[in-house]
Amino acid sequence: MPGQYAQSWLDWEAQSGGRSVLHGTPDEIKAMYAGLSQALKPMAPPFSENVDVTEGDVDGIKYRIYKLKGERGPLPIAFNTHGGGWMVGDLDTDHLLCGVIAEHTKSVVVNVDYRLTPDVAYPVPLEDSLKVYKWAAANASSFGGDPDKFYTIGGSAGGALALQIANKIKKDPQLKDGLKGVVALVPATTHWEAVPEKYKSKYKAVEDNKTGVPIIDGESMEIFFKYAKVDPSDPDTFTLLAEDNHKNFPPTYFASCEFDPLRDDAYVMEAALKEAGVPTKHDHYPGMPHYFWLIPTVPESKIFVENLLQGIGWILSQMKGATRSSYI
């Protein structure tokens, strides 16, 4: 059973006027998210002056590219998909984090603005992301990227996408060898209606955190899944079910949080990949809720970023011809 919230989180809630959980209609959730984003802006650190940002689109799907000034490349390519339940979020969601990754791991970061529910349903967010990924692979030299050193990265719904993209790309004869890693932060990997029997005893978080935990709870996930119109038994959406392809996944870094309905999604996916012989690394954050690093003033957010950079360093160190010290 879950333990106690970190005091730093409780202090933040007290300062900010109480606990926020994303519930309601899509319009209500979008309004709550916009309000939270505005409230957090004054707390955010400035964007690095050492990173150049360019923008473009692929058939109307917008992207941003982040690159450390003075780096000619070719550099590893971090392909980022933002979180938000496939319902909220945009290129600004992970803007600061993309800059940090570009500056401190010497990766060129491609950040994707896939379309959102309820205007579209699944698999459109995945299809949009794959379209930009394939463009990036074909045009890597134009932005200093190395098409043989891709890794996907994302949090929550974006973490699900990072794994979904990997599952798809590892089946593509032309692209499969270029994908070398996955960074899956508090990802959705299975649906509670279709958890494989061998993992059911380990999959308790959605009940432990069904109501009242911060940011999202189990009821929030019901809303996100409803409007995404996901099929609980689809392995292209829920990659825990893509068992035949697990052995082909690249090294994967996970992060999970205690008070999170998706906590065990990371644990069961890691167990499945380990069983298939895939190297994994996992940082868990006791006492913290889903996606807590959104709040920059919570001390654990700095620890999260430090661990994330180490996790990316671990991914990069396993790429052919690389050493960890080459990147961080």
Swiss-Prot record:
The pathway entry for this protein reads as: Mycotoxin biosynthesis
Which controlled-vocabulary keywords does the entry list? Hydrolase
* Gene behind the chain: Est1
Which Pfam families does this UniProt record tie to the protein?
Abhydrolase_3
Expression induction or repression: Expression is positively regulated by the dothistromin-specific transcription factor aflR.
PANTHER family in UniProt: AB HYDROLASE SUPERFAMILY PROTEIN C4A8.06C, ALPHA_BETA HYDROLASE FOLD-3 DOMAIN-CONTAINING PROTEIN-RELATED
The molecule here is called: Versiconal hemiacetal acetate esterase
Give GO MF terms, alphabetically.
Answer: versiconal hemiacetal acetate esterase activity
Q: What job does the chain carry out?
A: Versiconal hemiacetal acetate esterase; part of the fragmented gene cluster that mediates the biosynthesis of dothistromin (DOTH), a polyketide toxin very similar in structure to the aflatoxin precursor, versicolorin B. The first step of the pathway is the conversion of acetate to norsolorinic acid (NOR) and requires the fatty acid synthase subunits hexA and hexB, as well as the polyketide synthase pksA. PksA combines a hexanoyl starter unit and 7 malonyl-CoA extender units to synthesize the precursor NOR.
Organism, as annotated? Dothistroma septosporum (strain NZE10 / CBS 128990) (Red band needle blight fungus)
